[in-house]
Amino acid sequence: MNNRVHQGHLARKRFGQNFLNDQFVIDSIVSAINPQKGQAMVEIGPGLAALTEPVGERLDQLTVIELDRDLAARLQTHPFLGPKLTIYQQDAMTFNFGELAAKMGQPLRVFGNLPYNISTPLMFHLFSYTDAIADMHFMLQKEVVNRLVAGPNSKAYGRLSVMAQYYCNVIPVLEVPPSAFTPPPKVDSAVVRLVPHATMPHPVKDVRVLSRITTEAFNQRRKTIRNSLGNLFSVEVLTGMGIDPAMRAENISVAQYCQMANYLAENAPLQES
């Protein structure tokens, strides 16, 4: 028997499809999400409705974004969810979550078992809409969750950690073994909760500058910032901010990256493209 077939649907490798089928895990995730009637609930990648059904049972209305045409069609004819669903057969990477929040008249609560092959770029796409999002709950590769929650001075700490924590409070929820899926992925998974900050703990004047600094620093993470960011900051400027030029990218806190971004935004602002 082909272990990529689940409920009559062949999992597509190009979409990174692995279908959740462990009831205990499903119940735990739904409990963590705690959906309530009247909330603007949005699921990314509902697949075969493992989360859609138990979440939808608690709601009068649920919005789903599904790239796979066959799966979107299955949801349209779902025996009890169909009338509750608003289905966007679209790539979440190009979806405008701000427009949807405006249409629904409230911030979105976004959740999903995300395809692991696009999870990191999708996170960055969602970060650009955090003013339209109340919270997010995602199943991700465990290694990605580790990176999201990592602090300075750890191997997992990187650009994703800094940008996620700049935008959100990041909370790991539970770990999930490969056996909870069909077909089983080759990696462990985990569920994470991301809650956009109501008030930014480390406001920056231009988030594009923060993105640039973290990209340049972590692209050369083994170099000291005296070298990796030498084109942006002199040793004197770094020292003046209380940042040791001999530190590497992984030693610098989110607050310090934001401090550096604000200095650069004031003294060498990016030109509007």
Curated annotation (Swiss-Prot):
Localized where? Cytoplasm
Gene3D superfamilies documented for this protein: Ribosomal RNA adenine dimethylase-like, domain 2 (1.10.8.100), Vaccinia Virus protein VP39 (3.40.50.150)
**Which keywords does this Swiss-Prot/TrEMBL entry list?**
Cytoplasm, Methyltransferase, RNA-binding, rRNA processing, S-adenosyl-L-methionine, Transferase
Name the Enzyme Commission number(s) assigned to this protein: 2.1.1.182
**Where does it mainly reside?**
cytoplasm
Q: Which residues of this UniProt protein bind S-adenosyl-L-methionine? A: 18, 20, 45, 66, 91, 113
> What is the reaction catalyzed?
adenosine(1518)/adenosine(1519) in 16S rRNA + 4 S-adenosyl-L-methionine = N(6)-dimethyladenosine(1518)/N(6)-dimethyladenosine(1519) in 16S rRNA + 4 S-adenosyl-L-homocysteine + 4 H(+)
Gene Ontology CC annotation, any one: cytosol
Q: Which enzyme class, named as a word?
A: transferase
Cytoplasm is among the record's keywords: yes
One of its Pfam families is RrnaAD
What domain of life?
Answer: Bacteria
GO molecular function terms listed in the Swiss-Prot or TrEMBL record: 16S rRNA (adenine(1518)-N(6)/adenine(1519)-N(6))-dimethyltransferase activity; RNA binding
* InterPro entries referenced in this protein's UniProt entry, alphabetically: KsgA/Erm, rRNA_Ade_diMease-like_C, rRNA_Ade_Mease_Trfase_CS, rRNA_Ade_methylase_Trfase_N, rRNA_adenine_dimethylase, SAM-dependent_MTases_sf
Family, per entry: Belongs to the class I-like SAM-binding methyltransferase superfamily. rRNA adenine N(6)-methyltransferase family. RsmA subfamily.
**Purpose of the protein:** Specifically dimethylates two adjacent adenosines (A1518 and A1519) in the loop of a conserved hairpin near the 3'-end of 16S rRNA in the 30S particle. May play a critical role in biogenesis of 30S subunits.
Q: What is the name attached to this protein's record?
A: Ribosomal RNA small subunit methyltransferase A
